[in-house]
Amino acid sequence: GLTVALKNRDDSLSAGNDNYFSVQTVALGTDLPAPLRLQVTNTGSSPLAQLLVGAYHAPNRPDKPPLVLEGEHADEGVEVPASDASNGAYAQFTLAQGAWQALASWQLDHNQLETLDGRLYTPILRFYTPLPAGLLQFRVALSFPGLPPALGTTLYQFPAVSATEGQGYLMLAPLRLPFEARLLNVQPSPLLFSLQAYAPGSGSLTLKLDDIFLLPQENFTWFTSSVGLPVNASLIDDAFLQKTYTLANAKEMHTHHRIGDYFYLPPGETSWFFFFQVNPEGLAPIDLPINVKAWYRKRRRIL
């Protein structure tokens, strides 16, 4: 099987800052989708509470899809260097209370949108500091960049999601990028990805956004637990047996509930598997470490 060491980040500051692994399934010699067995070992110093895994399968696409929007790349924020932030910095934003506000935005060009391929993604916000008290809400809006606001440039506005006080991450409503049907041999138009926020009351709040991770939903599983995966224990997700369990001190136990499909490797494609981790305090530090080992079972079509 394949074994890789992963972190809770995907940037280019140093080798090994990866939250994914990839498999070239062309070399596996399988004619049918091959079930996958994953063993995720917690190599950190505290339990692992939430683990979200999303796969991106694509033929003839050698490059990894661009799934990270760094907070400091949004023009509306103030960049703050920080060694414990994704890409070495986060962005600080001022949110005026009492009305919805376009907090941060990123322009997605046609090359990025072609790679995103009209698929479904869940945006996961990672905050540098836990969210303050108050009924904070967040949502995403898509628009064409460069047009005057008077023309009503919002193309699609996704449902709002309420945040939890003290939490360091937030899963937003899934969205499709680009959201319209893809036309063969026609480049998609650039889009402005806008993060909007609302806080009741008057005055203002300061929000510190590290990054947004677009987790693929095509082949997706969410492992959730109130207990957590103990240090040095392994979470086994076995598509061979359709079974998920934890292995700790040579004993099998159940620590996590799973939501989603079991994983597979489609024939003749490149498959990327992306991981997002949350600790029991509801935070998502960038250097949470895991080791992932994967096996597949070859399947053949017999006539």
Q: Where are the regions a protein language model picked out?
A:
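Intrinsically disordered, low-complexity segments enriched in serine, threonine, and glycine
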Residues: 5-303
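Contiguous mid-protein beta-loop-alpha structural module that forms a pocket-lining wall or clamp
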Residues: 1
